């Protein structure tokens, strides 16, 4: 027979409440991260999701600097929610690597993709379209 004293029932109820609150907060945080990513992409001409020490990210930033363009840069290694943003990018574009570059809301990709878009002239067309 299971002892279901009132004290154990209260403890179990409190434990369930804490778990449900934590799940609710996690869902809220995920929605907040998703909203941040989408807002950054839609509100800025150029967005680079980057890490400050990453050589590929530095290359991407240098390309825009040479084009006299100033991207909105999100340095994931300098944010508490950087890992969550990377997982959101995985859901959104299928990649969680950095950099991830967006121009006028269009996903360009990583550093190699950006270099190819520059070489083909596609990047310049996207930048001129804004």
Swiss-Prot record:
Q: Which domain of life is it from?
A: Eukaryota
Q: Which residues form the Glutaredoxin domain?
A: 34-130
Q: List the disulfide bonds.
A: 54-57
Q: Where found, per UniProt? A: Cytoplasm
Q: Which GO terms describe its cellular component?
A: Golgi apparatus; Golgi cis cisterna
**How far does the signal peptide extend, from start to end residue?**
none
Q: Could you tell me which SUPFAM superfamilies the record lists for this protein?
A: Thioredoxin-like
Question: What keywords are assigned to this protein?
Answer: Cytoplasm, Disulfide bond, Electron transport, Redox-active center, Transport
Q: Which family does it belong to?
A: Belongs to the glutaredoxin family. CPYC subfamily.
- Describe its function: Has a glutathione-disulfide oxidoreductase activity in the presence of NADPH and glutathione reductase. Reduces low molecular weight disulfides and proteins.
Q: What is this protein called?
A: Glutaredoxin-C3
Phylogenetic lineage: Eukaryota, Viridiplantae, Streptophyta, Embryophyta, Tracheophyta
